[in-house]
Amino acid sequence: AFVFFQSLTLLLASLLILLPFKSVYAADIALIIDDIGYKSDDINAFTLPSEVTFSILPHTPYSLSFSQLAEQQQREVMMHVPMEALSGKTLGPGALTSNMLPNAIKASLAAAHKSVPNAIAINNHMGSKLTQLTLPMTATMEYLHEKGLYFVDSRTTRYSRAESIADKLGVPNLHRHVFLDHIPEPKHIAMQFKRLRRVANKYGQAVGIAHTH
């Protein structure tokens, strides 16, 4: 896994060099690396250009130290908040679920924020169930509005209501266009990068998400 992650990091870095954040079409591309915080090997991601945003899982062994290291690199950091999935998969610490009251959701987000104190935004880890539900997403957006944070919808379901609720409550938001590494093979990742570039050239901006491996 360690050797593969190094290869993935080098691939991502080389592709970023070939794919400027402002292309000749003035298209903006944002790249987010999810799932950071559980493994010491995640530190290898810090060799990526500082324009790459890290989304750190809260309450993990390295959430605070990696958050601080990212700040030293002037790298943007997000909280990768576990949210309930339709599959019922185990979510991990700091998870938001459909049976939580609004105050409990806000308290959970506040506690998670302490472990990633310089987060400027959150995105959902899983969340195919929760992002469809009005009440928990309203509580989430109310917290973000209060703290001046924004939301990136990982779009784990096409039925997500997160963006519409964020818009209603005045929370700046974006959504994921392309998952780069759902098939973690270099050829597939390169193909997905090309897809990301096409989306950016067509719409003027695109958000890609990749993961540590």
PLM regions with names:
Residues 25-213:
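Catalytic-site microenvironment of enzymes
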Residues 1-4:
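N-terminal secretory signal peptides that target proteins for export/translocation
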Residues 6-20:
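Bacterial N-terminal signal peptides
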